[in-house]
Design a protein with these regions (language model features):
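Compact, glycine-rich, soluble single-domain proteins
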Residues: 1-77
Length: 77
């Protein structure tokens, strides 16, 4: 099932299915090392409107909730 990154529980491993949004969003996430097909670990999803902290390719990346909501993922067991 494909859901938004903001809907996933902390500690979950997910695969990036696709990225919603325009070229600017896709380029920004690409510069941060986030691409469709990548496996990322959701380390912390801030309560309410806080940032989302993920680990991708061994690097910690903090994302605003608006950008995190544009990342559609599949939860990996």
């Amino acid at each position: 099932m494909v859901v938004s990154l903001t809907d996933v529980k902390s500690g979950s491993r997910v695969m990036v299915a696709r990225i919603r949004g325009g070229l600017g969003i896709r380029q920004r996430l690409s510069c941060l090392g986030i691409h469709p097909g990548d496996i990322i670990l959701l380390q912390k999803s801030g309560f309410m409107r806080g940032p989302v902290l993920v680990n991708v390719h061994g690097n910690q990346v903090a994302l605003g909730r608006g950008i995190a909501a544009k990342i559609l993922v599949e939860v990996k067991l």
